[in-house]
Design a protein with these regions (language model features):
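A basic, amphipathic helix-loop patch mediating RNA/tRNA/ribosome contacts
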Residues: 1-49, 82-83
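Conserved class I S-adenosyl-L-methionine
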Residues: 79-89
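Conserved S-adenosyl-L-methionine
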Residues: 96-104
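S-adenosyl-L-methionine
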Residues: 103-157
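A short glycine-rich, Lys/Arg-flanked "PGG" loop and its adjoining helix->strand segment in the class I
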Residues: 156-173
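Short, glycine-/aromatic-enriched active-site segment of Class I SAM-dependent methyltransferases
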Residues: 178-195
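Flexible, glycine-/basic-rich loop-and-beta segments that form/coincide
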Residues: 233, 240-263
Length: 263
């Protein structure tokens, strides 16, 4: 009986739209071959094998969907890259990076025992729990991509640290969370929810201007397709380091939070 790579067979059977998608499904543990979970896209299987695809959640948490949106919007490929994930928590971002072929991910979080067991057992993941990223002077190696999904801390505190970790030409994908950037008074007034477009613009301009001063060049900015806790709007910013902004910051912010929406 002839054999074929599993990822190729998934596409031929119409169970995946592309080999890249097939590889992500396999690496996420969502594919069974004759009833057994397969974890290697290159696995050689007989062409008449029984294939099952579990199309449940792609990632261990909804955070992975946020990063997925950024990778698609900015056309970023984490394949074979050394990455760091700040605020890893359950591991949604880390999972997304791995499923897109990251060579290694430093999963950093102040909590303990939160990272999903699947990721803990993945040899590509370096678990750095009970670790506050702001105090990490250097990682064991330079990274080419840093992702940030941090809570209760401003990006203005983290960005000066991240630039030390990055290799020249490295990139950062960061969730900008107005509830942690607008200040205690604004957050308290809205019971932890920042709803005013005026404040969204103010926060974004503040963070992006600071990033520019630190040598980060803004390459793209989009609104996250998923809301944060309590319904907070969040934004995904793409930076390169070192670099300059691709356009006027005020104009880039206005595209994401239009001025006509002001109260």
């Amino acid at each position: 009986m002839p054999k074929m790579r599993l990822d190729t067979l998934l596409v031929e059977r119409g169970l995946a739209e592309s080999r890249a998608q097939a590889q992500r499904l396999v690496m996420a543990g969502q594919v069974r071959v004759d009833g057994q979970v397969a974890l290697k896209p290159a696995l050689s299987v007989v062409t008449n094998a029984r294939l099952e695809v579990d199309l449940g959640p792609r990632y261990v948490s909804r955070g992975g969907e946020k990063l997925q949106a950024a990778l698609e919007a900015f056309r970023i490929d984490p394949g074979n890259r050394i990455c760091a994930d700040v605020g890893a928590s359950t591991g949604g971002f880390t999972d997304c990076l791995l499923q897109h072929g990251a060579r290694r991910v430093y999963a950093i979080d102040v909590g303990k025992g939160i990272l999903h067991w699947k990721l803990r057992q993945d040899p590509r993941v370096v678990v750095m729990e009970e670790t506050n990223a702001r105090y990490i002077r250097a990682l064991p190696e330079k990274v080419s991509l840093v992702t940030v999904d941090a809570a209760f801390i401003s990006l203005k505190i983290l960005l000066p640290v991240l630039r030390v970790w990055l290799a020249p030409g490295g990139e950062a994908l960061a969730l900008v969370k107005p509830q942690f950037e607008a200040g205690r008074v604004a957050a308290t007034r809205g019971q932890g929810v920042i709803r005013e477009p005026r404040l969204h613009r103010q926060v974004l301009l503040g963070v992006l201007s600071f990033a520019d001063q630190q040598g980060f060049g803004l390459q793209g900015l989009v609104r996250s397709p998923l809301l944060g806790p309590k319904g907070n709007a969040e934004f995904l910013a793409w930076f390169v380091y070192p670099g300059g902004a691709e356009g006027d910051l005020s104009e880039l912010v206005a595209r994401v939070v239009p001025l006509e929406n002001s109260p």
